[in-house]
């Protein structure tokens, strides 16, 4: 069932920031303090019993049709992958195939789920869907163009944004999924090297990263680098309290070229690769 989210109403007097914009350290520290003070579970109490380490990959979905068109797609728009996005997802899956992936969690939205499905095919592991991982509800901004707000001028009437999901709601969802993640990790029973993959969205992922690091009692990086499509943040979490974070891992995407004309079109699972067609001719 859809989650109940807190919404807020805003009036934009300035150009709204795009989701991929870098986030300053000041904002990150403020959010980290909010999260850290709110957690009641201290995992250091379990460190003497469990010295396990596990890896968590926080993946942003591959390129979607709305990414290409420059259209805002939050929780209300269920955007599909493009053909290029599908190729990105396959390359991503191939690049992490040697990890010991226990399971994949995904947002129910198509762009995330399709990306997650490619990973599960390679990893041969279960896929779990969680509404906690959905993108931010953009309210009345859903379906609007980035180009429109980029051309917005203060002398024009203020743009009133309604039903925008609040930061508190995003933090609550991030905490909720963090509980699921750490409960899964506790089940590793002293094993190390296990990996959990989480596929979500560009606006929500920084909130999830903060929640996870707060739970792990690990300082935030000096800056959270925005996720590119089909890139991931790698977190090696030591249940004893230390974690290592690598941001925006995307070397696996090198060499992928957008297919002319078709690359930006919506991916259709019924379509067959041209290589398969050519093989039948031989």
Swiss-Prot record:
Top enzyme category: hydrolase
Site residues by UniProt (Transition state stabilizer): 201
Keywords tagged on the record: Hydrolase, Nucleus
GO cellular component terms given for this protein: cytoplasm; nucleus
CDD domains: HP_PGM_like
Pfam family, one: His_Phos_1
GO molecular function: phosphatase activity
Intracellular or extracellular location(s): Nucleus
Record-annotated active site: 61, 135
Highest taxon, organism lineage: Eukaryota
The enzyme's E.C. designation: 3.1.3.-
Family designation: Belongs to the phosphoglycerate mutase family. BPG-dependent PGAM subfamily.
Protein name: Probable phosphatase C1620.13
């Amino acid at each position: 069932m859809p989650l109940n989210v807190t919404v807020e109403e805003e009036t934009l007097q300035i150009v709204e920031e795009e989701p991929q914009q870098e986030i300053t350290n000041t904002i990150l520290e403020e959010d980290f303090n909010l999260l850290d003070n709110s957690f009641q579970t201290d995992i250091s109490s379990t460190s003497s019993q469990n010295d396990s380490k596990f890896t968590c990959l926080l993946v942003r979905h591959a390129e979607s049709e709305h990414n290409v068109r420059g259209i805002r797609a939050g929780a209300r728009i269920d955007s599909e992958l493009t053909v290029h996005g599908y190729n990105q997802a396959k390359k991503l899956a191939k690049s992490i195939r040697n990890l010991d992936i226990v399971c994949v969690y995904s947002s129910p939205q198509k762009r995330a789920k399709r990306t997650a499905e490619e990973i599960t095919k390679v990893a041969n592991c279960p896929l779990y869907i969680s509404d906690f991982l959905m993108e931010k509800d953009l309210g009345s901004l859903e379906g609007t163009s980035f180009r429109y707000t980029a051309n917005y001028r203060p002398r024009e009437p203020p743009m009133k944004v309604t039903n925008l999901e609040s930061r508190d709601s995003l933090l609550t969802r991030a905490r909720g999924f963090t509980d699921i993640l750490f409960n899964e990790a506790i089940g590793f029973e002293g094993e190390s090297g296990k990996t959990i993959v989480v596929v979500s969205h560009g606006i929500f992922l920084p909130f999830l990263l903060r929640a996870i690091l707060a739970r792990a009692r690990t300082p935030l990086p000096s800056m959270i680098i925005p996720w590119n499509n089909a890139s991931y943040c790698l977190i090696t979490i030591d249940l004893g309290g230390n974690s290592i974070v690598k941001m925006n891992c995307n070397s696996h995407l090198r060499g992928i070229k957008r297919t002319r004309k078709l690359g930006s079109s919506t991916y259709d699972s019924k379509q067959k690769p041209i290589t398969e067609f050519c093989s039948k001719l031989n």
